[in-house]
Amino acid sequence: MLVHYLAVSSLAHRKRLFNSKTKGFHGEIVMDWGMKNRLTRLIQRDGKALFLPVDHGYFQGPTHGLEKPEKTLKAIYQYADAIMLTRGVLRNCIDPAIEKPIILRVSGAVTVVGEDLANESVVTSIQEILRLNVSAVSMSVFAGTKYENKSLSNLAKLVDECEDYGVPVMAVTAVGKELEKREARYLALVARVSAELGARVVKTYYCKENFEKVVEGCPVPVVMAGGPKTETQKEVFDFVYDGMQKGAIGVNLGRNVWQTENPVAAIRGIRAVVHDNYTPQEALDLFNQVKAGKA
């Protein structure tokens, strides 16, 4: 049974989702073997997940810290549960013998110098997705923009194609350049709409106020995005810990890992919070120990 698929930290949310008759979780009964297999690769046996995105180049170009993706990943990928990237980086920078699950970014065709980041299209076919043998796909969802209908329609069509082949879709709540949108009311709306359209996992931003409402209003697992790099490492551990306590199953953090002074120490600290229930201070202590070569 896929008992850990919808495991969350929030007890109330867990009780609401749990199906006592089947000893599993609501939604599992309609999943085929392929879908279950892919999801169990992404979400670990403790019901938690640490995804490492290195897909930023699809709209930012050679981002600081990702000038050479293969070099960036070499030291840190082992600490992630899955890696999120584009097909170009996958083909050219990743060893085909890698056993780490891959989440393929399939939306794009916009850049930071263009008119509107919300005007994304799906840039990969289902044939390509299967050819690359990935564990899941991801695409951005822009609600509240002039491209809202296009964005949500693209998500629905992608879900239709991927469900036919047992490939889970992760919807990525996107705000573009409008960072002020990162409040609970907006995030809860996008998360719920994405789940209603068939996304199996939702990636959204953390917000200090009412984040539990974002999670409780979403019937599929929620992972937290990192957003712009924080000023201190403690801030990262603080929001990851708080978000996990409020029901998120994990994180999808990139810049707050590979743009830090010590990416290995950063991802090990984050992993300790996600999988080992470390407090922010315990994670910071581990970060400093790794940084000093003592752990």
What are these regions (language model features)?
Residues 24-99, 104:
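Conserved N-terminal beta1-alpha1 strand-loop-helix module at the mouth
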Residues 259-291:
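C-terminal helical cap(s) of enzyme catalytic domains, especially alpha/beta-barrels
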Residues 249-258:
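Short acidic/histidine-rich active-site segments
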Residues 54, 87, 141, 206, ...:
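Short secondary-structure boundary segments
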Residues 101-106, 221-226:
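Short hydrophobic/aromatic-enriched beta-strand-loop microsegments
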Residues 51, 57-83, 107-109, 118-220, ...:
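Alpha/beta enzyme core
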